[in-house]
């Protein structure tokens, strides 16, 4: 979420900060502080790319990092939007895979995710 005290502290100490902004009010607070990138979570549950576009409309410079509910089925919707800096998601790597040491499979899945993102962004 957007905690003004944490954001202000980070800005004062020159620490990169990307607060979660789920409402137009939180986006306005971020912009007021000069931030250029915010996180949007939970993306799909909070309205997805349509909500991001609506909140970003008044702020040409603002970019979003959506996470939550993003997967191979909707990644293109996000990465095709110029308001999206990057996307995150646990769909690439499940916690059990890490705990079980399935690093070869993780490598394959991450490579596939990168290839999909590159295809969307650069084609």
Predicted region positions:
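C-terminal helical cap(s) of enzyme catalytic domains, especially alpha/beta-barrels
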Residues: 10-16, 96-123
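N-terminal active-site wall of soluble small-molecule enzyme domains
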Residues: 1-12, 24-32, 48-49
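Glycine-rich phosphate-binding active-site loops on the catalytic face of alpha/beta enzymes
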Residues: 1-6, 39-48, 83-105
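Hydrophobic faces of well-ordered beta-strands that scaffold small-molecule active sites
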Residues: 17-20, 38-40, 63-68, 85-89
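Short beta-strand/loop segments at the ligand-binding rim of alpha/beta enzyme cores
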Residues: 5, 9-18, 58-66
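Catalytic cores of alpha/beta
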Residues: 25-33, 70-86
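Conserved, mostly hydrophobic/aromatic
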Residues: 38, 78, 113
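Glycine-rich beta-to-alpha transition loops that act as phosphate-gripper elements at the mouths
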Residues: 1-3, 19-24, 43-46, 66-72
């Amino acid at each position: 979420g957007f905690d003004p005290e944490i954001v202000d502290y980070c800005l004062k100490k020159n620490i990169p900060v990307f607060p979660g902004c789920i409402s137009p009010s939180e986006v306005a607070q971020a912009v007021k502080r000069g931030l250029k990138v915010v996180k949007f979570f939970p993306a799909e549950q909070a309205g997805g790319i349509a909500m991001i576009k609506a909140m970003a409309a008044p702020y040409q410079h603002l970019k979003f990092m959506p996470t939550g509910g993003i997967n191979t089925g909707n990644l293109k919707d996000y990465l095709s939007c110029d308001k999206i800096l990057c996307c995150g998601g646990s769909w690439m790597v499940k916690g059990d895979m890490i705990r079980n040491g399935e690093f070869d499979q993780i490598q394959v899945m991450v490579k596939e995710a990168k290839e999909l993102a590159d295809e969307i962004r650069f084609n």
